[in-house]
Design a protein with these regions (language model features):
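Extended, helix-rich structural scaffolds rather than catalytic motifs
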Residues: 3-181
C-alpha cells in the first residue's frame, strides 16, 4: 500500500513572518520530520509573510497537516490568554512573552517526539526513516536559515511554561475528537 502512495505537496493556510509568530517555522520542521514529511515555507513575490507547506506521502502528509494545525491552534489560544493577562504592559514585552511561549512549546514538542522515538527504538526496534520519494521530491527546496530576533530575546518563565506544555502535547486528543464529530 505504501509503495502505491503518491508524494503530495500540501500548502496550509498558516502564515508567519520574522516579526509575527516566527516559532511556526520551527514547529513545522519538527512535526514534519516526525510524520515522515518535509516542512517548508514559501513566500509570494513582494510579501514578507511566509506560508507553510509539507511534502510527504499521501497518508503521512494528511496526518502531519492535521497535527500541525492543531499544535499551532494550541499555541495561538494560549497566546491569546497571555495577551489578555498582560494587556497593561508595553506591546514589545507582551510580544516577547508570546514568542517565548511559542518557542518553548516548540522545544517541548521536539523533546516529546525525541522521547517517543527512543521508546519506539527500545521497545519495538522501530526507527522513523524519511521515504526516499519524499527526499527526492523535496530536493528543490532551499536550506535557507530562518532566523528571527525574537529567538535571541526570550523570556524565561514563559519559555519554560511553553516547554512544559509542549512535552504534554497529545495530538490524539484533538484528532480523536474530530473523528467522532
Amino acid at each position: 500500500d505504501v509503495e502505491k502512495q503518491q508524494v503530495k505537496d500540501v500548502r496550509t493556510d498558516i502564515t508567519c513572518s520574522k516579526r509575527r509568530d516566527p516559532w511556526i517555522v520551527s514547529l513545522s520542521a519538527i512535526i514534519g520530520e516526525n510524520y515522515c514529511c518535509k516542512g517548508y515555507r514559501y513566500r509570494r513575490y513582494g510579501e514578507q509573510t511566509n506560508c507553510i507547506g509539507f511534502i510527504g506521502l499521501e497518508d503521512d502528509v494528511e496526518i502531519c497537516v492535521a497535527v500541525f494545525k492543531y499544535a499551532v491552534d494550541c499555541v495561538l489560544s494560549e497566546i491569546k490568554n497571555i495577551k489578555k493577562e498582560n494587556a497593561c504592559y508595553y506591546s514589545d514585552y507582551v510580544k516577547r512573552l508570546c514568542n517565548s511561549y511559542g518557542y518553548g512549546f516548540t522545544a517541548g514538542v521536539s523533546e516529546a517526539f525525541r522521547k517517543q522515538q527512543e521508546e519506539n527504538e527500545q521497545g519495538w526496534g522501530l526507527v522513523l526513516v524519511m521515504p526516499k520519494e519524499v527526499e527526492e521530491a523535496s530536493q528543490h527546496l532551499g536550506h535557507e536559515q530562518f532566523q528571527s530576533r525574537a529567538q535571541k530575546h526570550l523570556q524565561g518563565s514563559e519559555y519554560y511554561r511553553g516547554f512544559e506544555e509542549g512535552t504534554e502535547f497529545d495530538p490524539t486528543k484533538r484528532l480523536g475528537e474530530e473523528a467522532t464529530v
